[in-house]
Amino acid sequence: KTLGSNVHVCAVGSHATAAMHSVRPDFSIEQLIYGLPDYAQESFPPYDISYAGGRPLFVTVGSFEPRKGQDIFCNAIRLLKPEVRQKAAFLFVGKAADKSLKNAVDALVEDYPDTVFYRKRLERPEIKSLMDQCACVVCASRDDPMPTFVTEGLIFGKPSIVSEHTGTAGLITEGVDGFVYKDDDPDQLAKVLEHAILHPEQLAAMKADCRKMYEKYYSNEAYVATLTRLVNESTG
């Protein structure tokens, strides 16, 4: 099948584009990434992360379901050497849509109560404050077109560790504004986590580049500019 000249197809990033090309390889697909407001310019009450004990906090946010890969993150945390794991804190935020995944997180919290934490829900101001204070966000999704909480981290200059099966992975410059691991492999994720935990100064130094990534791809201004260009090209 072919598209008429008046039909234009857009996707939110390389991961969604690849999925569309798997069934329609001849389609020309433009990139149109959503825009998020600059939450860093807003005022919000501080969210208490004293439970992290001053250690770098690694955060994942999202409903517990197989697609989101919380089990992969759990397994990666378990694979860390004890002396490495205790240098960091880990927070899972999300509603337990899948009981087996919730059980995996609960077991992890029980085994490492001073290191791993779970919150069912945080209010929007709390999420913003969390992103402002955390060291890194982790997205272990098996399939995720463009995870919003990772973008929210970028707004505050926070690097991410993401699966290759995320749209974010296609935009990351490795070691500059984030890290990508492959094959949904907990061992690979554990190795990236270990590096990040042992080099917190590198995470902090990535702040400016992470912020640039937000401004270039995810800001409202970037979205409006891309949409305007696409409309002009379609009607010109």
Q: Residue ranges of each PLM-predicted region?
A:
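A short, active-site helix/loop in glycosyltransferases that binds the activated sugar's phosphate group
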Residues: 2-29, 36-38
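Conserved acidic donor-binding segment of nucleotide-sugar-dependent glycosyltransferases
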Residues: 174-175, 179-186, 195-200
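Aromatic "clamp/platform" in nucleotide-sugar-dependent glycosyltransferases that forms part
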Residues: 142
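Short hydrophobic beta-strand element within catalytic cores of glycosyltransferases
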Residues: 159-162
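Short, structured helix-loop element that forms part of the nucleotide-activated donor/catalytic region
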Residues: 16-21, 91-113, 126
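A short, well-ordered alpha-helix in the C-terminal region of glycosyltransferases
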Residues: 188, 195, 202-217, 223
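Short alpha-helical donor nucleotide-sugar binding micro-motif in glycosyltransferases
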Residues: 121, 129-134
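Conserved donor-binding/catalytic core segment of Leloir-type glycosyltransferases
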Residues: 10, 50-68, 74-77, 91
